[in-house]
Regions:
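Hydrophobic ligand-binding cavity/cleft-lining segments
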Residues: 1-48
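Short, highly charged C-terminal tails/helix-capping segments
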Residues: 4, 133-140
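Intrinsic-disorder/low-complexity, polar/charged segments enriched in Ser/Thr/Lys/Arg/Asp/Glu/Gln
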Residues: 13-19, 62, 75, 90, ...
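Generic structural detector for well-ordered beta-strands
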Residues: 17-23, 58, 66, 94
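A short, structured loop/turn motif at beta-sheet edges
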Residues: 26-27, 68-73, 95-103
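Glycine-rich portal/gate segments that line the openings of hydrophobic small-molecule binding cavities
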Residues: 34-84, 90
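Structured surface interface patches that mediate subunit assembly and partner/cofactor docking
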Residues: 38-41, 48-52, 110, 126, ...
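Beta-strand/loop substructures that line and gate deep hydrophobic ligand-binding cavities in soluble
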Residues: 77-79, 83-133
C-alpha cells in the first residue's frame, strides 16, 4: 500500500484548507464576505454583486472564474484561475457557527504541486488575517 503525502488526493490533485474562528455571527460574516468590500478581501476587486450561481467573474488583477454553487449563510463554491495559471482550481468558502463566533474556512483543490499547496495556504492565511483586522475594526 502506497501512502500519499499530506494534501495529495487520489484524483483531485493537491488540496489545502485554512480556517479561523472570528468573533462575528454567521449572518453578519456572510453579509460582509459577499459585499463588495468583503469580496475584495478574499476574491479580489471587480467581482460583480450580488454573487449568484452560474455567473462568471474577472477581478481587476485578471483572476477569472465562475460561481458553481451558493448556499446562503453556509458556503460558496467557485472556480478560480489567477493570471498565468493554465487550469482552474476549485475554491470553497464555508461558514459555520461556533460557540465563540463563526468559523470561516477556505478550501482549495486541483492544485498542481506541494509547492502550490503551500503558496495557497499562505494566501488564505493572509486573507484571514486581513478579514480579522477588517472585522475587529468594525469595517463590517
Amino acid at each position: 500500500m502506497t501512502t500519499r503525502p499530506t494534501g495529495l488526493t487520489k484524483d483531485a490533485g493537491w488540496q489545502v484548507g485554512v480556517s479561523r474562528t472570528l468573533p462575528i455571527e454567521v449572518g453578519a460574516a456572510w453579509d460582509y464576505l459577499l459585499s463588495p468590500a468583503g469580496l475584495a478581501h478574499w476574491l479580489g476587486d471587480g467581482v460583480p454583486t450580488p454573487l449568484e450561481k452560474g455567473i462568471t467573474y474577472k477581478t481587476t488583477d485578471g483572476t477569472t472564474g465562475q460561481i458553481r454553487s451558493l448556499h446562503p449563510r453556509d458556503r460558496v463554491r467557485l472556480t478560480w484561475r489567477p493570471p498565468g495559471r493554465r487550469q482552474d482550481t476549485i475554491v470553497q468558502l464555508v461558514l459555520q457557527s461556533t460557540a465563540t463566533g463563526c468559523s470561516v474556512r477556505f478550501h482549495s483543490d486541483r492544485l498542481t504541486s506541494q509547492r502550490e499547496r503551500e503558496a495557497m495556504r499562505a494566501h488564505w492565511r493572509n486573507v484571514l488575517d486581513r478579514l480579522t483586522v477588517a472585522i475587529s475594526s468594525d469595517d463590517t
